[in-house]
Amino acid sequence: MAHFTLDTFTFNKDVRKVSFGEYNIRPPLIKPSKLTYVENGGVGKELSDGWALNFAIGCIHACPFCYVDNIHKRFTFARVGDVVQRPWGMYFLKPRNIDEAIKKTPWKRWKGKLVMMSSTHDPYLPQLYPTSRKILEKALPAGVKFLIQTRSVLVTKDLDLLSEYKDQVILQVSIATLEEKFASIIEPRAPPPKARLEVLRKAKEVGLKVGVIVAPIFPPNKVREDVKEDLEMIMKELADIGVDQVFGEMLHERGMNMEYIESLLWEKVKIDKELDEELGKMFTELLNKYHLRGKWWYEKH
């Protein structure tokens, strides 16, 4: 196990050390995505009809488990330079030409198609609002459907707009744990999980379809020892809210994320096929117990 200090990755709520910048984004804003059904040529995650809308590079939440940092370090470097070599959560670029890109995107081309917003960053980061609303104001009247994936509470600012097009919208949040100390380590700049549950309640009150990705589920560790107890607490809350769909998956190794995580937890984290099967069984049993509709996403080992 590599030994890093917290200062190495600066996973804290202070964003003053983040490298902020701009880049040019190429329209159309909607691009192909593998986060869809296998029948659509995807990886078996039912999050879109094979389309995603991303409009930033980086994410301020700084979750150490995130797979996106590995993508940027491998593929985005040639386009934006050394900034993506900084630790995850310490670089963030937004498009300087976003208004032009919104205007040049032929939204009606995706009429009736489910688009994920967003797959490589949170679309409701403070640095991106009200850009997210500008996009929706153009896309929703054109008939585009959206699965909005967020950890932010800022989405509640747009419930008026989203409820107007409720047949075209699924509002979905990510929750990895309800244990507050553990959440503060693995989701250092995201709003607390209980605040995200409140987002779902407010969305249901205005008639929106809502979902949750319970992920990533970590194996037992010194900070959060009892996985089943944590999962059961989550499922109880989701059943009480009346969540429409629930997906789950365990922690996966991507790029340097395991080194980040182990340095923050100060212990080795073991993940393997046996753990995936054990957690998948536990998750499915809890879905059935609380009469929730959903699915466990198994890793392809």
Curated annotation (Swiss-Prot):
Chain ranges passing through the membrane: none
Gene3D superfamilies reported for this sequence: 3.80.30.30
Alphabetical keyword list: 4Fe-4S, Iron, Iron-sulfur, Metal-binding, S-adenosyl-L-methionine
Record carries keyword Cytoplasm: no
Protein name in UniProt: Uncharacterized protein ORF301
Pfam families, sorted: Radical_SAM (PF04055)
Listed CDD domains: Radical_SAM
